[in-house]
């Protein structure tokens, strides 16, 4: 039986690349992040324990085109309300998740999503694929010499669980991007 990732690429990659994908050292069952916690503050959701995660890399890597980088002053004060450190904050991004406009910010290993009502955490955890333990996936990729060189520049990127139409349009745009 092929590893999970090889089964996915089987339908999308040319035969030579598919043969290479079969040799990748991905785990058969992708591990889950057991260190993640979330809390609500007013109309904000704070998700902590989401390493490795780099919001800026995720939103600008070309997998989604509905994310806009905001000036740093827009997030001033929000981190203090949640008990987080402004100094470790990355830029904030405005985007659309399942038809909802949201502002997302990161401080160290915490992610802040606003606006968010109580009970909506699962929507954002699923979209950003925060349940998956990407450090275990990166460790499996590091076992391959060819992929090890790519890890420093791509560490922290997570695959967004976009709506199918959004993923299709993002793929078409990135394929036609010069």
Identify the role of each PLM range.
Residues 1-20, 24, 32-35:
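Short terminal hydrophobic/aromatic SLiMs and anchors at protein ends
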Residues 19, 29-178:
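HhH-family (HhH-GPD) DNA N-glycosylase catalytic core used in base-excision repair
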């Amino acid at each position: 039986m092929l590893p999970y990732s090889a089964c996915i690429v089987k339908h999308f990659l040319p035969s030579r690349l598919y043969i290479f994908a079969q040799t990748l050292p991905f785990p058969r069952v992708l591990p889950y992040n057991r260190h993640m916690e979330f809390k609500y503050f007013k109309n904000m959701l704070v998700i902590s324990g989401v390493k490795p995660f780099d919001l800026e890399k995720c939103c600008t890597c070309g997998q989604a085109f509905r994310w806009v980088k905001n000036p740093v002053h827009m997030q001033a004060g929000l981190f203090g309300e949640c008990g987080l450190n402004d100094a470790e904050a990355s830029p904030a991004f405005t985007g659309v998740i399942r038809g909802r406009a949201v502002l997302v910010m990161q401080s160290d290993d915490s992610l802040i999503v606003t606006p968010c009502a109580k009970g909506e955490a699962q929507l954002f955890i699923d979209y950003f694929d925060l349940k998956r333990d990407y450090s275990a996936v990166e460790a499996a990729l590091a076992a391959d010499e060819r992929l090890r060189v790519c890890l420093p520049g791509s560490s922290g990127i997570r695959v967004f669980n976009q709506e199918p139409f959004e993923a299709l349009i993002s793929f078409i745009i990135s394929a036609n991007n010069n």
